[in-house]
């Protein structure tokens, strides 16, 4: 059995997330997803949705066999427990593949690291969705326009 692990924040779940998880699942027989803890999200703005809600939504997705919250102190602990054959990264995740492979090997983990390409649609990231919401549904400008397309 080929075990795959996907990781992410998964804030404001969107088609790009689903694409990432579907493509990750296609690489193996079992997909486990590690959802970032609120306290550990430091490389971008804090999530809008609390970690328990993000975890619940990920668990409900068809491609996902198992989902869990990441460890508060050691991001490699859940990976070591799962012992995946493959770890996938999203197109915009900040990890360097070779550095991650090295860190895994230091812990006795021999998982391949695969970067999944971006979703081909226009709303492939939470930041793009937020930007579009603000541009199309934000407060009206002084001229009376609502910024709608």
Curated annotation (Swiss-Prot):
Query: Does the record bear Thylakoid in its keywords?
Result: no
What GO molecular function annotations does the UniProt record carry, in alphabetical order?
ATP binding; FMN adenylyltransferase activity
Essential cofactor(s): a divalent metal cation
Give the GO biological process terms. Answer: FAD biosynthetic process; FMN metabolic process
Which EC numbers does the record give?
Answer: 2.7.7.2
For this UniProt record, give its keywords in alphabetical order, as a comma-separated list.
ATP-binding, FAD, Flavoprotein, FMN, Nucleotide-binding, Nucleotidyltransferase, Transferase
Q: Which Pfam families match?
A: CTP_transf_like
The enzyme's first-digit EC class, named in words, is transferase
* Keyword Nucleotide-binding listed: yes
- Identify the pathway: Cofactor biosynthesis; FAD biosynthesis; FAD from FMN: step 1/1
Catalytic function, reaction form: FMN + ATP + H(+) = FAD + diphosphate
Residues at which ATP binds? 9-10, 14-17, 92, 119
Note the InterPro entries from the entry.
Archaeal_FAD_synthase, Cyt_trans-like, FAD_synth_RibL, Rossmann-like_a/b/a_fold
What is the purpose of this protein? Answer: Catalyzes the transfer of the AMP portion of ATP to flavin mononucleotide (FMN) to produce flavin adenine dinucleotide (FAD) coenzyme.
What protein family does this chain belong to? Belongs to the archaeal FAD synthase family.
Indicate the quaternary assembly.
Answer: Homodimer.
What this protein is called in its record is FAD synthase
Q: Which organism was this protein described from?
A: Methanoculleus marisnigri (strain ATCC 35101 / DSM 1498 / JR1)
Q: What is the lineage of its organism?
A: Archaea, Methanobacteriati, Methanobacteriota, Stenosarchaea group, Methanomicrobia
Gene name per UniProt: ribL
């Amino acid at each position: 059995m080929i075990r795959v692990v996907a990781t992410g924040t998964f804030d404001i779940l969107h088609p790009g997330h689903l694409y990432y998880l579907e493509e990750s699942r296609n690489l193996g027989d079992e997909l486990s997803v590690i959802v970032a803890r609120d306290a550990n999200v430091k490389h971008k703005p804090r999530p809008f949705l609390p970690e328990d809600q993000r975890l619940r939504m990920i668990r409900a997705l068809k491609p996902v066999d198992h989902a869990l919250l990441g460890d508060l102190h050691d991001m490699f602990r859940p990976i070591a427990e799962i012992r995946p054959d493959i770890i996938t990264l999203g197109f915009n995740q900040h990890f360097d593949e070779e550095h991650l492979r090295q860190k895994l090997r230091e812990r006795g983990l021999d998982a391949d690291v695969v970067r999944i390409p971006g979703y081909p649609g226009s709303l492939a990231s939470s930041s793009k969705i937020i930007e579009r919401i603000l541009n199309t549904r934000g407060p009206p400008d002084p001229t009376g326009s609502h910024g709608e397309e």
